[in-house]
Regions:
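Phosphate-binding P-loop
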Residues: 2-7
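Hydrophobic anchor at the beta1->P-loop junction of P-loop NTPases
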Residues: 12
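Conserved lysine of the Walker
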Residues: 20
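Short glycine-rich substrate-engagement loop in P-loop NTPases that contacts/grips substrate
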Residues: 42-74
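Structural recognition of the conserved hydrophobic beta-strand(s) that form the central parallel beta-sheet
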Residues: 77, 101-107, 128
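Short regulatory helix/loop adjacent to the ATP-binding pocket of P-loop NTPases
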Residues: 110-126, 141-142
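Interdomain hinge/linker elements that couple catalytic modules in large macromolecular machines
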Residues: 135-178
């Protein structure tokens, strides 16, 4: 949120399943809650089959350009952008051609490649996401009051700090196979 409306591409990076997509979903909701019209937000998860025909950056550029709001800033939120070949060319063109604020996630190896770094040098900021720390893990999960701090730490060591694990019930006496 601190880089919102700054003329830099915001690249959310982190290991797989650390919550990058969830962060973008929360940001989308934040925009709506703060008065941004839904028509001024384009949020696409490019792994969805809905976008299967957008693998070429020119087709992708045309598709998105047709949907950019005619007035006011448009927020472009792209998840798993690396599925678009030469996506960095489309992103730079959006920056140049429209009043947009751009947020992207995807595979670290593709997003921070040399070609991309060269094209957008000085025009992007990386937002690194890490798994939850032990303190965040304690704040994030609900444990029964009778579970000791040692047992909670063992759960943290066993399962790590991935937000998806919130779906598991650590209080139940059952084995979770990873």
């Amino acid at each position: 949120i601190q880089n919102k409306d700054v003329d830099l591409v915001k690249i959310v990076t982190g290991i797989r399943r650390c919550g990058k997509s969830s962060l973008l979903d929360l940001f989308h909701q934040h925009l709506l809650n703060h008065g941004v019209a839904d028509s001024n937000i384009i949020h696409m998860n490019l792994e969805s089959l809905r976008y299967r025909d957008l693998k070429d950056y020119l087709v992708f550029y045309d598709y998105v350009s047709e949907r950019i709001a005619k007035s006011g800033k448009t927020y472009l939120i792209f998840d798993e952008l690396q599925v678009i070949e030469h996506w960095e060319k489309a992103i730079e063109s959006f920056r140049l051609d429209f009043d947009v604020d751009i947020y992207i996630t995807g595979s670290n190896a593709y997003l921070l490649s040399t070609e991309f770094s060269t094209l957008l040098s000085g025009r992007y900021v990386e937002i690194r996401m890490l798994p939850l720390s032990f303190k965040e893990f304690l704040d994030f999960y609900e444990f029964a009051p009778d579970i000791s701090i040692e047992e909670k730490f063992q759960k943290y060591l066993q399962f790590g700090g991935m937000p998806i694990l919130r779906e598991y019930r650590f209080n139940e006496a059952r084995s979770i196979q990873a």
